[in-house]
Amino acid sequence: MILRANALLFDNDGVLVDSHAAVDKAWGILGEEFGLEGFSISNHYGTRAQDLVLKLVGEEKFEAANNRINELEQSSADETNPLPGAHELLHSLTAGIWTICTSANGNLGRARIKAAGLPLPEQFVSGDDVANGKPAPDPYLLGAKKLGFDAGDCIVFEDADAGVKAALAAGAAFVIGVSKRALETDADIVVEDLAGISFDGKQLVIPEAKILRR
């Protein structure tokens, strides 16, 4: 499959890096400490931590809970590995045609990318950089703007429902869901992983064998 666009915007966790075990553990501890009975972070992947914390504990406990989840996630940032195809694809891309738009705060996002041995883009969008996190379109609108493009010139790679909603709301040219988890989203196309995918600045080539849904 060939798709035409001028730039690529990547979510990080679940698309480029595998951090879910560390994320699940950190939020599990937070849930125990703050009495969040029955809470599972798996239902909220892709959501900015500060937004979720406020929703879960309210304003009175927000500062303590937000500081705690930041501490827990930062301490486990090195428990991160690259997902299939991420290393090869990112290292093949020239500067200025790709960036990462993560819901994580800047320090955490960069730490996970570094731990996975992946390159950092010249431009980078974290949850700290936008007024509204995913599923609002802000992260992808800003990512495209930093590269000098409209969102409609960009292809977005996402794994979580909140992120897919953000990309669609931003008006991305295509939204590619990554992993079987993305089959539950409204992504335009869903692929198994990034292995074998290539981009020359004009055309994205996806191996047919990697496509789970089109």
PLM region spans:
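Residue-level marker of regulatory loop/turn positions in helix-turn-helix DNA-binding domains and
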Residues: 82, 101, 132
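Small/polar loops that bind or transfer phosphate-bearing groups
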Residues: 18-19, 45, 100-101, 158, ...
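Short, surface-exposed connector motifs at secondary-structure boundaries
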Residues: 91-97, 148-151
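Proline-centered loop/turn at the N-terminus of a beta-strand
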Residues: 97-99, 174
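Asp-based, Mg2+/Mn2+-dependent phosphohydrolase catalytic module
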Residues: 1-6, 104-214
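N-terminal helical cap/lid subdomain that shapes the substrate entry/recognition surface
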Residues: 2-94, 105-110, 118-119
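A generic structural signal for short
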Residues: 15-16, 78, 98, 128-129, ...
